[in-house]
C-alpha cells in the first residue's frame, strides 16, 4: 500500500527528504534519517496502533519504557532525525523504533501496560535550553524561563539586592546555603556561582566548598589581574568554571592585560562583544583564543534598529549609574557600539561566538534566549545566505550550529554535559516539544526528568483540555516530591564530598559539575572558529582574519509581534 507524502506527514509527521519551516523564519530543515519503520509506525488513539496485543506488549514495567514520545522530529547538534524516544527512570533510554517486539520487527523501544505515550507526530523535539548567565533577582524568572523551554539555569544572586542587580554572584557560604535551599522549590535545574573577586584563595575556596559550581569575576567588584589569576587558580584546584565580566574602563589594564592574566587557562567570557560589559572597545578580541569560551547575552541578539537606544537606558539602571553625572553617561556610551554589535551577529554565524544566554533582568530577558538565538540565525541567512556546510535547499548545519549555542555548548562549558544538554541516550530527560509554526517562540510541552513540568493548557473546568483561555501552567512535575525527583541541583564535587546536601537538608536530586578545566574552544560543537580579531580604536570597525565584519541592523524580525497578540 502506498500513500502520498502529504498524507503520511499528516498522519505520522515528516520523514526523510521532507522539509519543515521553523516558525515564520526563512530557516528550513530537512529530515536526514528516519528511525521508524514504514508500515510499522506506532501511534496512540482510538483505532490506532498502541493497543493491547498490537503496538503494546505484555512485558513488565522493568522491560518497557515509562514514556514513549512517538514519531518526533528531533533537532539536536548531532542530527535532524525522525524517531520514537523512550524515557525510563527520568532519563532518555532509547532513540529508535517503538512498539511491541512480540509482533513487530526492529523494535528497540518496548511499549507495555506501564508505558505512557506523548504524541510527537508533526512536532519538533529538542533538549531543554541551558541559560548560563542568570542574575537570580526574583524567583518569578524561573517560571518565565521554564515556559520558554529553558530547563537549566546557572548564575548567582540573592534576590533584588543591589549587588545581584548588577552581578551574578551568590556571595559567601551563608547566601549559598539559603539559595540552595530555595532551589528545592523550583522545577528547574539550578547551579550557583560564587563571587570570584578576591586576591587570596581562601575566600573563594570556602564558596566552592559551600556548593558554588563556579566563580564569577565582575568589574563592579574589581576584576583586576590579581583577582583573575587567583580565581582561575582556585577553579583549577576544585574543577569549577570561571565566568568573567571584564574591565570596561580599562582601569587595571587593557584587554591584553586580562588575556595575559588568564595564562592560557579555561574561562567563560560573558557578553564577549562588550555591550553587556567588558574592555572597551575591543573585548571582542577574546573570541579568538583557544582557552576562551565566548558567549553573548540576548539584548544584542540580533542587531536591530532599536538595539543602541535600548541599551543605553538598560545600562544606566543595571549598573547603578546616574544620568546627571557626565562620567556615568560617558561610561555607558563607551560600552554601546554599533560596529561591534554588528560584528557579533556575523561571528555567531561563523561559529566564533559559541553560546547565547540571557543576563536576566540585568540587561537581558530570561524568557527570550531561544527566540533571539533563532532570530539571529534567520537574520544571518537573509543577509549572508546559506552556509557552505548546509545541504541543498536546507539550513540543517545552521540549525545545528545555533541550537548548540543554548544546549550542548553551555553544558560542556560548565561541566554538566554528562547530565544535560542534548537529546542523547543516558541524559536527563529534559525535553521540549514544539509545533513547527511556534518553534523557538512558544513550546507546547516541557518535560523535566521525564515528567511533564509545564504545558500550554486550556480552561481547567472545560470538558476537554483545549478551550480558551489557553496559557502556560505548571504541571504535576512542578509540585511536591515529583519536583524533587525530576529536577537537579548542581553543586561542586567538594561540596558533595563534604556532605553538604545532607547538612542543608536538600531534597532535589544532586548532580556534580566536572571536567570544567580542560575544556577548549575546539570542544564547543559547531562553534569552534578562532579568528584573529582586530578592532579599530577610532571607528570601532571589526575585522576577522583581515575581513571587515559589518551587517545592517534588522528593521523587522520574525518570531516577534505576530506571536504575542495572544
Curated annotation (Swiss-Prot):
Positions that bind Ni(2+) 2: 216, 245, 271
Residues in Urease domain copies: 128-566
Secretion signal span: none
GO MF, one example: nickel cation binding
Cofactor(s) essential for the protein: Ni cation
Record text on cofactor binding: Binds 2 nickel ions per subunit.
Keyword Hydrolase among record annotations: yes
Pfam families: Amidohydro_1, Urease_alpha
Keyword 4Fe-4S assigned: no
Residues that coordinate or bind Ni(2+) 1: 133, 135, 216, 359
Active site: 319 (proton donor)
Metabolic or biological pathway: Nitrogen metabolism; urea degradation; CO(2) and NH(3) from urea (urease route): step 1/1
Keywords: Cytoplasm, Hydrolase, Metal-binding, Nickel
Listed GO biological process terms: urea catabolic process
Record localization: Cytoplasm
Posttranslational modification: Carboxylation allows a single lysine to coordinate two nickel ions.
Residues that bind substrate: 218
Taxonomic superkingdom: Bacteria
NCBIfam families xrefs: PRK13206.1, PRK13207.1, urease_alph
Record-stated family: Belongs to the metallo-dependent hydrolases superfamily. Urease alpha subunit family.
Subunit and partners: Heterotrimer of UreA (gamma), UreB (beta) and UreC (alpha) subunits. Three heterotrimers associate to form the active enzyme.
The name this protein goes by in its record: Urease subunit alpha
Lineage of source species: Bacteria, Pseudomonadati, Pseudomonadota, Gammaproteobacteria, Pseudomonadales
Gene: ureC
Amino acid at each position: 500500500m502506498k500513500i502520498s507524502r502529504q498524507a503520511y506527514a499528516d498522519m505520522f509527521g515528516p520523514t526523510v527528504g521532507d522539509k519543515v519551516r521553523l516558525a515564520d523564519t526563512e530557516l528550513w530543515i530537512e529530515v536526514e534519517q528516519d528511525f521508524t519503520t514504514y508500515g510499522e509506525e506506532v501511534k496512540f488513539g482510538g483505532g490506532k496502533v498502541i493497543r493491547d496485543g498490537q503496538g503494546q506488549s505484555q512485558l513488565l514495567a522493568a522491560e518497557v519504557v515509562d514514556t514513549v514520545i512517538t514519531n518526533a522530529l528531533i533537532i539536536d547538534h548531532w542530527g535532524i532525525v525522525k524517531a520514537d524516544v523512550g524515557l525510563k527512570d527520568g532519563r532518555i533510554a532509547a532513540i529508535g523504533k517503538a512498539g511491541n517486539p512480540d509482533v513487530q520487527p526492529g523494535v528497540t523501544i518496548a511499549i507495555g501496560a506501564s508505558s505512557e505515550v506523548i504524541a510527537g507526530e508533526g512536532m519538533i523535539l529538542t533538549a531543554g535550553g541551558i541559560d548560563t548567565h542568570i542574575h537570580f533577582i526574583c524567583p518569578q524568572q524561573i517560571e518565565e524561563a521554564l515556559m520558554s523551554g529553558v530547563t537549566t539555569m546557572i548564575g548567582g544572586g540573592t534576590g533584588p539586592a543591589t549587588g545581584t542587580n548588577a552581578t551574578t554572584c551568590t556571595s559567601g557560604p551563608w547566601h549559598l546555603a539559603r539559595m540552595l535551599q530555595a532551589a528545592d522549590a523550583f522545577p528547574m535545574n539550578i547551579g550557583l556561582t560564587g563571587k570570584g573577586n578576591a586576591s587570596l584563595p581562601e575566600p573563594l575556596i570556602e564558596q566552592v566548598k559551600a556548593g558554588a559550581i563556579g566563580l564569577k569575576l565582575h568589574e563592579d567588584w574589581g576584576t583586576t589581574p590579581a583577582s583573575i589569576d587567583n580565581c582561575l587558580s582556585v577553579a583549577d584546584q576544585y574543577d569549577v568554571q570561571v565566568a568573567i565580566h571584564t574591565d570596561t574602563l580599562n582601569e587595571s589594564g587593557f584587554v591584553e592585560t586580562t588575556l595575559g592574566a588568564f595564562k592560557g587557562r579555561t574561562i567563560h567570557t560573558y557578553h564577549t562583544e562588550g555591550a553587556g560589559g567588558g574592555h572597551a572597545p575591543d573585548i571582542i578580541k577574546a573570541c579568538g583564543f583557544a582557552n576562551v569560551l565566548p558567549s553573548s547575552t540576548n539584548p544584542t541578539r540580533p542587531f536591530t534598529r532599536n538595539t543602541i537606544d535600548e541599551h543605553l537606558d538598560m545600562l544606566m539602571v543595571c549598573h547603578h549609574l546616574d544620568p546627571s553625572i557626565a562620567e556615568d553617561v560617558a561610561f555607558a556610551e563607551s560600552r554601546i557600539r554599533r560596529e561591534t554589535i554588528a560584528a557579533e551577529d556575523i561571528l555567531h554565524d561563523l561559529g566564533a561566538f559559541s553560546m547565547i544566554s540571557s543576563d536576566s533582568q540585568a540587561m537581558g530577558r530570561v524568557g527570550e534566549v531561544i527566540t533571539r538565538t533563532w532570530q539571529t540565525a534567520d537574520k544571518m541567512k537573509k543577509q549572508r545566505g546559506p552556509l557552505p556546510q548546509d545541504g541543498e535547499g536546507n539550513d540543517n548545519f545552521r540549525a545545528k550550529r545555533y541550537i548548540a549555542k543554548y544546549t550542548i555548548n553551555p553544558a560542556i562549558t560548565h561541566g554538566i554535559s554528562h547530565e544535560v544538554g542534548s537529546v542523547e541516550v543516558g541524559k536527563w530527560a529534559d525535553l521540549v516539544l514544539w509545533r513547527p509554526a511556534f518553534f523557538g517562540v512558544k513550546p507546547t510541552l516541557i518535560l523535566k526528568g521525564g515528567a511533564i513540568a509545564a504545558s500550554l493548557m486550556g480552561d481547567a473546568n472545560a470538558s476537554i483540555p483545549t478551550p480558551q483561555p489557553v496559557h502556560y501552567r505548571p504541571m504535576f512535575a512542578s509540585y511536591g516530591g515529583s519536583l524533587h525527583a525530576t529536577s537537579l541541583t548542581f553543586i561542586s564535587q567538594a561540596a558533595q564530598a563534604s556532605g553538604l546536601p545532607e547538612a542543608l537538608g536538600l531534597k532535589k536530586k544532586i548532580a556534580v559539575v566536572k571536567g570544567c578545566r580542560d575544556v577548549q574552544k575546539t570542544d564547543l560543537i559547531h562553534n569552534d572558529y578562532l579568528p584573529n580579531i582586530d578592532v579599530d580604536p577610532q571607528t570601532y570597525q571589526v575585522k576577522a582574519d583581515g575581513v571587515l565584519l559589518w551587517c545592517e541592523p534588522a528593521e523587522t524580525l520574525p518570531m516577534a509581534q505576530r506571536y504575542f497578540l495572544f
